[in-house]
Structure formats: structure tokens, C-alpha cells
Curated annotation (Swiss-Prot):
Molecular function GO terms recorded: water channel activity
Keyword hit for Repressor: no
SUPFAM superfamilies: Aquaporin-like
Family: Belongs to the MIP/aquaporin (TC 1.A.8) family. TIP (TC 1.A.8.10) subfamily.
Record InterPro entries: Aquaporin-like, Aquaporin_transptr, MIP, MIP_CS
Source lineage: Eukaryota, Viridiplantae, Streptophyta, Embryophyta, Tracheophyta
Name of the protein: Aquaporin TIP5-1
Membrane-crossing segments per the record: 23-43, 57-77, 98-118, 135-155, 182-202, 226-246
Protein location: Vacuole membrane
Amino acid sequence: MASNNLLVDLKRCFSAPSLRSYLAEFISTFLFVFTAVGSAISARMLTTPDVTSSAGPLVATAVAQAFGLFAAVLIAADVSGGHVNPAVTFAYAIGGRIGVPSAMFYWASQLLGATFACLSLNLFSAGEEVPTTRIAVAMTGFGGAVLEGVLTFLLVYTVHVVGEREPRSRGGDGKREFAATALGALAVGLTQGAFVLAAGALTGASMNPARSFGPAVVSGHFKNQAVYWAGPMVGAAVAALVYQIMACPSVTGNVEAVVV
């Protein structure tokens, strides 16, 4: 019986809607990582050596990531759910909202999108090296992983609260649904930008394994990659479990969940 279920799941992974979902995740992750890494390159190119301690580049990167993630989630929301992040997909898999086989294809699409985005930037960045996410000199790997975990927990919990909806909505007022989706995507993007401002100088505030993986592949620098996988994945898992407890009436009593 288990083997039959696995075969059914695998068959669904190659259906037309599933293939469109993978493409949507590839494109949306490409968009976000291209924006995030590209803004970091541009900020570095426009910063002179005597003002490297200025907050300007960090603010510019935070704003770019906020709007980049907003756009990425919005364009993929009705096709794939707009995960744009392996940690979000992992949380949905833990919550039973996506099958493990499909989640693996989502991860592959996201990692490929991030890698191709960085390859594109490497071609057109006028000799500038693709920057990788790094932890501060005074911070340990464990401390960095914990911080990334906390940030990702908050981000993924936000995703669950404002963006809990099925791809290809089941009828209703299209304009109102789009407005609700856009508002949810904006909330996620603003959360990303706020956390970049809060912790960008400490760990880069990645909160997204694909965001760190793409630059590492292109640059060849994989130092502290474990920080950007272990922390976000654990944080995402905890967020999924906490959200289930908060939103499940059988656990919390008569709680009326507002679902976008």
C-alpha cells in the first residue's frame, strides 16, 4: 500500500500543474536572488573605500530584498504557492501541505533558480565577484545558525499567517483575491527587508538556503554553508509546528483562523 501511494505521488510530480509549479519556483527564486545579490553588488560598486561603514548599502540591500521577495511571491502565488525558499517548502512538507516528492522537486527548482541568477550576475557584473552570505567575525557558527533559525522562524510563521492559500484559488472575486495575495506578499517582503536591516551585518540575514547556495556555487566559497542550511531548516520546522498548534481548533479550542 505504501509503495502504491509513493508511485501515485511520483506520478503527480510529473503532471502538467506540477511542472508549471516547478517552473514558477525557478523563475520566482531567480527573480529574488538576482535582486538580492545584484543589489549587494551594486551597493558595493557604488561605495567608496572611505565610507564602507555607512549604513547606506545595508539599507539599499534591505529595500531591494523587500520588493524583490514581494514580486517573487506574487508572481508565483497562484501557480506554486510562491515558496521561493527551501525553508518554506520544508515547513509546508512538515505541515502536510505538500508531499515529500513534490518538495524535493521544489527544492531543486529553487536551488537551480538561485544558481542561474548568480551565474547571470557573474556574467554582467563588470568583474565584481558574486558576494556570499557570511557571518560576522565576532560571531560563532553556532551563534549564526541560531540567529538564522530565529529569523527564519519569524519569517516562515509570517508566511503561514498571511499566505496560507492553495495555488489556483477555487473561484470567488478575482480582484479581491489578488488584492489579498498582494497584501500577503507585501507583508512577507517587508518582513524580509526588516530582518536584513536588523541582522544583515551579523549573518547577512539570509533566511533562505537557496539565497546562500547560489552565490556559494558561483563563487566557489562554501564556508559556513551549514549555518545557512541548519538554522533556517530548524527554524522553519518549528514555525510549522507552532502554526499548527496555534491554528488547529482541536488543540487550541475554538480559534477562528483568518486564511488569505
